[in-house]
Amino acid sequence: MQEGIYDKFVEAFKEHVKTTSVVGDPFKDDTFQGPQVTKTQFDRVLSYIESGKSEGATLVAGGEAYKNVGGKGFFVSPTIFTNVKDNMKIYREEVFGPFVVISSFK
């Protein structure tokens, strides 16, 4: 994201995710995001979240298992990281989960 609009974009995107990314039963019409396919993938996404935190990225939203689904499924809260550098694992590798990294350039 271009440095001059970075902060404004991050705030707008965060609000958009809050109102759009409805987590829940994938068979309901209002659901935007269902569960991870397997426990292995669920654990993999959570490990990327831990990697982002430990490498110094800023967790803006999500970053945890999503619990409000009646105890069924492998749900992850929509996750947003900012201040991501190009040498970080979460920047270099595809997560395949509800996960966005935002970095800036001049």
Residue spans for each PLM region:
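NAD(P)-dependent aldehyde/semialdehyde dehydrogenase
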Residues: 3-106
